[in-house]
Amino acid sequence: EQSVIWNSWLRLEPNYNQEIVISDSNQRHKDIEAFENDINTAFSEIRRILKDNKHFSLTFHSLSGLEWKAVSNACVFNNFNVVDYEWLEQKTYPPRQLNRVKSIKGDVLVTFRKNPEPVRLRVCDDEQFTTIVSDFITETIENGITDTNGIMMAIMEWIFRNMIIVGNVDVFMILNKQFQLSEDGHWNIK
């Protein structure tokens, strides 16, 4: 992991309890719920120290819709508005990303602005959210964006920009269950 390199270079002792990660280790107790709580705590602290209308940027990569949910909800709850949303493509991909057509390749770079106004949330129940995401994916495919990267980046940008709170729904699962992936790596409407 990069944190090992940075800690070594900076001659720091890592404090694994303070890391915002998901770990399979039984000793670390870093599951998706802890990740969501830690991310929200971090974003609350960013909101506390950041001046009104000032910016911060976040890079993120995950294959888990629940991790994306944790990040997007923390941004929305803390009233950060998207200023810029970019896809950072890598020049070369690790084998894990190359060999999976359902994989997201690269990172997203999102720049947010601290909105000093009261937050205006768009809250849907899980069934409503699943329906509007399914409709959004259908529209995205009909507009010619059919690869996993394009679809997932469009969904996440839409969630961020519309300040939608995501419930217990994994957007990757909506894509996988309600749409069909062709052999050449393009999603189709079932």
Please tell me what each predicted stretch does.
Residues 1-190:
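S-adenosyl-L-methionine-dependent nucleic acid methyltransferase catalytic domains
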